[in-house]
Amino acid sequence: MEVLIGDPITTCLSPSVYDIICNLGFQLRENCDINSIVTQNGEVCWKTITDCVSYTESEQGLDYWGSVRLLGPVCEAVHSHFLSLTKGQFEIRYAPWFQWTSFPELFPEIFDALESLQSPAISLSLMKLTSCLERALGDVFLLIGKECPFLLRDLLSSEELAQVFSQSVMNVLKVFVGSPCGLNLRNVLWHGFASPEEIPPKYCSMMILLTAGLGQLLKSYLQNTKLTLAHRSFISLTNLEDLIVFPDVTYEVLSVLEEVMMKSAFILKIMLPYWEVALVKFKSHRFADCAILLLTQLETGLRNVFATLNRCPKRLLTAESTALYTTFDQILAKHLNDGKINQLPLFLGEPAMEFLWDFLNHQEGPRIRDHLSHGEINLHEFSKETTNQLLAFSLVLLLRFVDDCLLSVFKEKSAVELLISLAEGYSSRCHPVFQLKKQVLSCEESIRVWALLPFPEELTRQAVRLEDNSETNACHSLITKMTDELYHHMPENRCVLKDLDRLPTETWPQLLRELCSTPVPTLFCPRIVLEVLVVLRSISEQCRRVSSQVTVASELRHRQWVERTLRSRQRQNYLRMWSSIRLLSPVLSLILLLIALELVNIHAVCGKNAHEYQQYLKFVKSILQYTENLVAYTSYEKNKWNETINLTHTALLKMWTFSEKKQMLIHLAKKSTSKVLL
């Protein structure tokens, strides 16, 4: 791919960041006695370490460069010490001090990585260590504090942790992982800036020792305060079932990926070892490890494309402490910091952007990079299916950066052709638009069950008589008029229901499915579109709650009838409930149809002026208020079935009045040429 042809990139670290990580800690050549750092029993001598931390002249801040320089020999001694131990000795001496973390079994694995001397494995170990440490420190914070800071930097600066571990100890951690002015090991690795050879292994060894030392300090604190450390539960990734688009990665696909990795311009040569280890981890069923490496390298590669397309080559490098890094947040944004259009989304296309937003950014998506980097996921339970999706997407992305002749060869493989086809057809699964479609269809299914609810035959005639009143008839008349109006705004096809007393159960679900399968643009949705979606989703959720309550109440009353435990008043209430249900079923179905049609035309809201928009928002919020009241009236506690009829009549009048103003989105949108087949 010509877009990335240029001089080979030898580092993604800016000069000063490269200097502090790769050079500064090696300037002092003095030997440091390991016995002054850690005892034979594995007890950390914190004073030796904290004495190496330098401060500015005013003593108001840390001298990060001076501290890294002085800590260099200490890290060297610790690294040599660990390499001199057998794994058994390491575990006997240090394993007890990792129990305070929520992932103590990680540390013997890191020890193995250190002994292997393989740079990518050591970098991966540091990433996992920093995420584990962050999670554990958050648990400690909650011994005293109430709301744990989201960023590690803010966590390390908190008074709560200083109270537990001392400020001098927290300053040591800041030098290693807590500030862009220091080594900043967490961020340069998790954001894919550091190549394997650029992370000195001794810093990994030092982080192991610091974690053990923190465990020792915490034990003393807990003994003195009589407090007990509780670990927060790991989170479960959300909406994963919706995100499984690609089939399982086969050995054939893996072999193609291995070949493409060597030839795709997307991968920086200095980063290739990470990709190679990622595949090794996948084959050995270490799916979280594979995902971590893929995510960091997707960020690296996309940052390179971003910097090239937007002609800002310096954005490829780590920023200095005075500027922001270029991370996924900026890479996947619509605009650059200066307000210009980001060229990357235009180059990648909507399907690829939607995939990345689904996995990384959407609040209702799995946000796997965030959760992995903050230590919120149990790595042992990370699913193969999730890693499958990342691997398949990565292959399709890499193929965009090989020459056309090679691409043609790979496309001849049916497995590769299928992945490309699926990737090109991808649409968001985590955007509020998709979630609303899911809600509508789920709620429709729930309401359809009402027709199957049992009702005593001997009560049917009485229930029908209750329905024959002026207000109920007025409701049915309004439903017919509203439905007629909505059906005139179907995409091209028009169909009018004449008999709402007999809901067309065969065609109604199909109609909603067709509407919910209509593509709606989701990438970079305007704020007002998202505001309307929030209200529509709330309406749908209240409809679901009503449906659930109706089902539960009906089944309970029928059981009581069969068991002959219904008292006289309860029997009358049962009749009113059944009469109400026969009205609520078409009303809720009408609301779902309205939601689906407004959703198809959701972007028409951008054409409203401020006054029109506020009027429209008031309208949809009035429907929300109605459904919220329905939830209250149909609850087991209130059981006000008669009142739902008056409530419904008032709501339908408001809906019809607003409809006559022709200010709904269906009235503003241009006619679609797509067909809804009934």
Swiss-Prot record:
Noted disease: Periventricular nodular heterotopia 6: A form of periventricular nodular heterotopia, a disorder resulting from a defect in the pattern of neuronal migration in which ectopic collections of neurons lie along the lateral ventricles of the brain or just beneath, contiguously or in isolated patches. PVNH6 results in delayed psychomotor development, delayed speech, strabismus, and onset of seizures with hypsarrhythmia in early infancy.
Membrane association type: Multi-pass membrane protein
Keywords: Developmental protein, Disease variant, Endoplasmic reticulum, Membrane, Transmembrane, Transmembrane helix
Xref: Pfam families: DUF4209
Protein name: Endoplasmic reticulum membrane-associated RNA degradation protein
PANTHER family the UniProt entry points to: ENDOPLASMIC RETICULUM MEMBRANE-ASSOCIATED RNA DEGRADATION PROTEIN (PTHR31701:SF2)
Disulphide-bonded residues: none
GO cellular component, one term: endoplasmic reticulum membrane
Localization of this protein: Endoplasmic reticulum membrane
Function: May play a role in neuronal migration during embryonic development.
Membrane-crossing segments per the record: 390-410, 587-607
